[in-house]
Design a protein with these regions (language model features):
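Non-catalytic cap/lid and distal C-terminal segments of serine-dependent acyl enzymes
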Residues: 1-265
Length: 265
C-alpha cells in the first residue's frame, strides 16, 4: 500500500486544503484485483467527524490494512467543521465535495471515474455528509455508508449547544426542513426518482447519543421504500466501534459492484 498526502489549492474554497489517500500497490489474493489488471481502482471517499480531521481514519483505525485486503483506494479529505455543506457564512464545502474534489482526485490518482466504482462513507458528521452528498448527487456514487451519523437533526436536542457554529453553517432557520440540508427531505427526493439506484449502509451503536437520530432516519427512509442495509449492536460514539464497522462497510461492498475490466474476447 501507498499512503499519499496531498496539499493543494481549492478554487471553490478559495484556500488551501488537503487529503490523504491509500492506494493499493501489490496484488492481493483477489484474482479480480484492479492492480493485477492495471485498471483504474474502485474508490471509497471516507469522511471524518466533527472533532477530527482528514488524518483521523489512518491514525485511529487500521483502514490501510483493510483497504489492502479489498484492493480498493481510499481518499480521506478534510472538511473542517462544515457538515459538508455550503455554509451560510463560510466555505462552500458541498460544492467542493461534489464538483472540485472528484476532479482533482481523478487527475492525481489511479482511480476509476465510473459511478459504479465510486463509494462514499463517513462517521458522525461524516456520516451525515456521506448521505447528504450521495442523496443529493446519486449520479456520482454507487453506494454510501453512515457510521453513527447525525442523520436526523430533528431528533437531536439543542444541536446549537453541541455546535456553536450551527447558525454560521446552516443559517438562522437551521437545517430541519431545509431542502438542501435535511436528510429526510433529500431522501424523499431520492425516493421519487429511480434514475440512479444506490445502495445504502447505516449502522449505530445502541449506547451512542445519536442512536435515536439513526433509528428515526431509518424509519422514515423505510416508509419511503428506500432499502438500507442496517446494523446495530452495543457500542458508543468512539473509534473502537468505527474501526470495527468500517470493516463491515468494506465487506458490504459486493465484488460484483466493483468494476471488473472487460475481457479480451
Amino acid at each position: 500500500m501507498a499512503l499519499i498526502h496531498c496539499d493543494f489549492y481549492s478554487e471553490v474554497l478559495g484556500t488551501g486544503t488537503a487529503f490523504d489517500a491509500i492506494i493499493p500497490m501489490a496484488p492481493s489474493t483477489n484474482e479480480n484485483a484492479s492492480i493485477i489488471n492495471n485498471s483504474p481502482l474502485p474508490t471509497l471517499f471516507l469522511l471524518h467527524g466533527l472533532q477530527s480531521d482528514y488524518t483521523a481514519w489512518t491514525r485511529y483505525t487500521s483502514i490501510e490494512r483493510y483497504a489492502e485486503e479489498k484492493d480498493i483506494a481510499v481518499v480521506m479529505p478534510d472538511a473542517g467543521r462544515s457538515f459538508y455543506t455550503n455554509m451560510h457564512k463560510g466555505y462552500r464545502y458541498f460544492d467542493f465535495f461534489t464538483d472540485e474534489l472528484p476532479r482533482i482526485a481523478n487527475r492525481l490518482l489511479p482511480i476509476s471515474e465510473r459511478r459504479e466504482d465510486r463509494f462514499i462513507a463517513g462517521l458522525s458528521m461524516g456520516g451525515y455528509g456521506a448521505f447528504k452528498i450521495a442523496l443529493s448527487r446519486p449520479d456520482q456514487y454507487r453506494g454510501a455508508a453512515s457510521l453513527s451519523g447525525a442523520l436526523s437533526f430533528a431528533s437531536i436536542e439543542e444541536p446549537d449547544s453541541l455546535l456553536p457554529e450551527w447558525p454560521i453553517i446552516f443559517g438562522p432557520s437551521g437545517a430541519v426542513n431545509n431542502p438542501e440540508n435535511d436528510l429526510i427531505l433529500l431522501a424523499r427526493e431520492f425516493a421519487s426518482s429511480n434514475e440512479h439506484p444506490m445502495d445504502l449502509f447505516q449502522c449505530c451503536g445502541t449506547e451512542d447519543f445519536l442512536y435515536n437520530a439513526n433509528r428515526d432516519f431509518l424509519k422514515e427512509a423505510q416508509k419511503l421504500g428506500i432499502d438500507i442495509h442496517y446494523e446495530e449492536e452495543p457500542g458508543e460514539h468512539e473509534w473502537g466501534y468505527w474501526d470495527m464497522k468500517v470493516q463491515s462497510v468494506l465487506d458490504w461492498l459486493p465484488t460484483n459492484r466493483i468494476h471488473q475490466p472487460d475481457s479480451d474476447a
